[in-house]
């Protein structure tokens, strides 16, 4: 398992949570959402860990300095989506090696599951891999659109999804 860079997306406003606190700072089982993700990331021993911050920047950066002092932060002033955030985080880094992009609000990730994912990605010599999950109630989440061979075609945000796509779990 080798991964050069991990990018953690932590700029979201957490609108669905209806809280003034940055989404990634909310606690689950005694640790912030972001803390759970960074705990899993520690297992990978990545050369670079970059965390994209936005909403609640000051408090999020303060929290990061306490729980992941070796990580660096990148400010996403205008929310331009996942691709834009990854592009900001990659600026100035070598284009070599595996890059893992994670959402900062996924507390169920483990170091073992990330390592297995990276191993599968590297073994398959894929240009890109997407780790997905099925959710019993996908309301508010994007949908993974696949072809007949179960290959990923695209990711569609719920607001942009057709009625048929909204039935995808």
Report residues per predicted region.
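Conserved core of the sugar-phosphate nucleotidyltransferase
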Residues: 58, 109-169
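Short beta-strand/turn micro-motifs composed of small residues
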Residues: 10, 53, 103, 132-133
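Hydrophobic residues at beta-strand termini and immediately following loops
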Residues: 28, 74, 155
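Glycine-rich N-terminal loop/short-helix segment of MobA-like nucleotidyltransferase
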Residues: 3-28, 44, 67
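Short glycine-enriched loop/turn motifs at secondary-structure junctions
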Residues: 18-20, 102, 165-169
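Conserved N-terminal catalytic core of the sugar/cofactor nucleotidyltransferase
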Residues: 1-5, 31-119, 123, 146
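Conserved beta-strand segments of alpha/beta enzyme cores
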Residues: 24, 70-72, 151
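Conserved beta-strand scaffold positions in the cores of enzyme catalytic domains, especially
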Residues: 25, 73, 128-130
